[in-house]
A protein has these predicted regions:
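Terminal, non-globular segments
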Residues: 1-168
């Protein structure tokens, strides 16, 4: 139990540090920004209590907001991501699968399942984040393009992290 807690605390800290120190400084073609820190929400165990999931999601976003001076933008996007995560899991997984496997990993669930799961969560996060950031539907096509391209980059980075960190 303590080892798992330390492992997830490390994932929290490392994902925030990577986001704040590296990925926030990556802007491709003035529109594509990776949001790697969502990895923490993605990797939480299936049996994480809903209140804890929401608290951790909000804390993750708030921590990034503090470092990037974006009051509430990341916190609200992460809170929404944490809120919809249980529904997404129920939508794409059977009850037996969620009870027999402890956490979402490529090794546990398979590449196709994991990529679909990550894509769904990242798209929701990015849609909310970029439209809150724009705070208007003016320039809707440009914002939607940013959502799609940034989502692709974020999903690729998150899935690649599985092969780098959890290789056997």
């Amino acid at each position: 139990m303590v080892i798992n807690l330390l492992k997830y605390a490390l994932v929290f800290v490392v994902s925030v540090l990577l986001q704040v120190l590296i990925f926030n400084n990556v802007l491709i073609a003035r529109m594509i920004s990776p949001f790697f820190y969502i990895l923490f929400i993605v990797l939480l165990p299936f049996d994480t209590p809903r209140a804890m999931l929401l608290f951790l999601s909000f804390s993750l976003g708030l921590t990034v907001d503090i470092f990037t001076n974006t009051p509430g933008v990341n916190a609200s996007a992460c809170l929404l991501t944490g809120f919809i995560r249980p529904g997404v899991l129920q939508l794409i997984s059977s009850r037996e699968t969620l009870e027999s496997v402890t956490a979402p990993r490529v090794g546990n669930m398979g590449f196709q399942w994991f990529a679909g799961y990550v894509t769904f969560l990242v798209l929701i996060h990015h849609l909310f984040l970029f439209f809150i950031e724009a705070f208007t539907f003016q320039g809707f096509p440009f914002t939607l393009l940013r959502v799609i391209l940034s989502s692709v980059l974020s999903v690729v980075l998150i899935v690649l992290s599985q092969f780098i960190i959890f290789r056997k």
